[in-house]
A protein has these predicted regions:
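Terminal low-complexity/charged segments
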Residues: 1-206
Length: 206
């Protein structure tokens, strides 16, 4: 077992749940949502462990668990060449919220936005929590949740109408749009405003 697990249990007590070594070589440990920020800060800053690299943030939903939704953080200690998978269990029937780790690892920014967009998990303290794959006014819910219908909740024509009604200038920064293939297809005046850092207004729905 990764020695970090024993150190976590000694430091945080009941906030640390089940732990196991996985077949992929990673060690998995469950943490209560209310202590996540403390645990992650400890993992990053404690010299003996120092998980300095955040590999990924994602989520998984299971049907047969009391708290079926897990937010999963994959950490690596580059110095120690150790891997740790930290999991927080949440219940979709209650408040889907956990502290953001973006203040600890800036690379968590878009990863947490994707989990919010696809699963509806709110990351408290995130500097810019909004959808990243679906448009900002997307109203069908969270596409990777188990209760999301295969074909969506709206008709195909309504989905197309809503997508065409989106104003990308209002919802995305110059940085985001400039790396997208569709950027070259935007009107010239819109690209110029984006270069100046301006934002437009969301079009009114008809």
């Amino acid at each position: 077992m990764n020695p970090t697990v024993g150190a976590l249990q000694a430091t945080f007590g009941n906030a640390i749940g089940r732990a196991s070594d996985m077949r992929d070589g990673w060690t998995s440990v469950t943490v209560t949502a209310d202590r996540l920020r403390d645990v992650m800060t400890w993992l990053r800053d404690t010299p003996e462990h120092r998980y300095d690299y955040l590999v990924d943030v994602t989520a998984v939903e299971y049907r047969d668990r009391e708290r079926p939704l897990e937010v999963v953080y994959q950490l690596r200690s580059l110095e120690r060449k150790a891997n740790l998978r930290v999991k927080v269990e949440l219940d979709p029937r209650g408040e889907l919220a956990v502290d953001s780790v973006t203040p600890l690892w800036a690379g968590a920014d878009w990863l947490e936005r994707e989990v919010y967009d696809m699963f509806g998990v709110v990351f408290a303290g995130h500097p810019d929590l909004r959808r990243i794959l679906m448009w900002e006014t997307y109203a069908e819910g969270y596409p990777l949740r188990k209760d999301f219908p295969l074909r969506g909740r709206f008709s195909r024509s309504e989905q197309v109408r809503q997508a065409l009604n989106v104003n990308p200038e209002a919802n995305y920064s110059m940085e985001e749009l400039s790396i997208a293939e569709a950027y070259d297809e935007l009107p010239g005046d819109m690209r110029e405003r984006l270069r100046r850092g301006e934002r437009g207004k969301v079009r009114d729905s008809e």
